[in-house]
Design a protein with these regions (language model features):
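Positively charged n-region of N-terminal signal peptides that target proteins for export
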Residues: 1-5
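Bacterial N-terminal signal peptides
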Residues: 7-16
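Accessory carbohydrate-recognition regions in carbohydrate-active enzymes
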Residues: 23-230
Length: 230
């Protein structure tokens, strides 16, 4: 009996010692994730910031070329016409690209333009050598404007941060007409708050989703100095 008690006490001592060990540091497993897998060929994978099952997929939208651009991003193309808040990923058909936002410097236009003519619209090349693509975070410099665009997302919100060069002509263009592939806007509109820090708007469209209705609110860190409708 005495031997049994000794063994039992030793077992508890070993257990207590094990409990006293420091917890291992949590490993950052997302560092092994490559969100750009599937962005070439016929992969149709979206690149940008989102969370699982979120309503927002905020990221760059390129000048559309053909079926392989239906996610808004293709690894062979570095053009950007804006950062849209909804994208499909890995699908065989295109839609969405709702509420496209583009930071610019200089003359403002609503034309998206074509790559063959750099002055045909507001589009810019993205500096892919400095592009950062991580789970939940996206960043890229816009070569034409000297602007760095960063974004992240929650399940319902896309958050943008634009770093502009020193300029009196910095602006942010909201394009409610832009849509993915077969998507076409049927009704759009928005209103500004009295202090010019908030936009409330809507975009109705038809396409793969025949009666899609998107409502949004955008808040700025600084009041807009002026508002132009194009």
């Amino acid at each position: 009996m005495k031997l049994a008690n000794i063994v039992l006490c030793a077992g508890f001592a070993a257990l207590a010692g094990a409990c006293a060990q420091p917890a291992p540091e949590a490993e950052n497993l997302t560092r092994w994730v490559d969100p750009k897998i599937g962005t070439g060929g016929h992969g149709h994978v979206f690149v940008g910031a989102n969370v699982p099952f979120g309503l927002v997929q905020v990221g760059p939208t390129s000048i559309p070329q053909d079926w392989d651009w239906c996610s808004g991003y293709h690894e062979s193309d570095s053009t950007v016409i804006g950062f849209s808040h909804t994208h499909l990923s890995g699908t065989g058909i295109g839609d969405l690209f709702d509420v496209t936002v583009m930071p610019v410097v200089g003359e403002v236009t609503c034309a998206r333009g074509v790559e063959e003519d750099p002055q045909s619209g507001l589009w810019s090349y993205a500096d892919r050598s400095k592009e950062v693509v991580e789970p939940g975070y996206y960043s890229v410099p816009l070569s034409r404007y000297g602007i760095t665009a960063e974004m992240t997302a929650t399940s319902r919100v896309g958050l943008h941060r634009y770093t502009f060069p020193a300029s009196d002509d910095a602006a942010v263009v909201f394009d409610l007409e832009n849509g993915g592939c077969w998507d076409k806007a049927t009704e759009t509109g928005f209103t500004f708050s009295e202090d010019s820090t908030r936009i409330s708007g809507w975009r109705y469209s038809t396409g793969w989703a025949r009666d899609q209705k998107v409502y949004f609110v955008a808040e700025f860190s600084k009041p807009a100095k002026g508002i132009t409708y194009l």
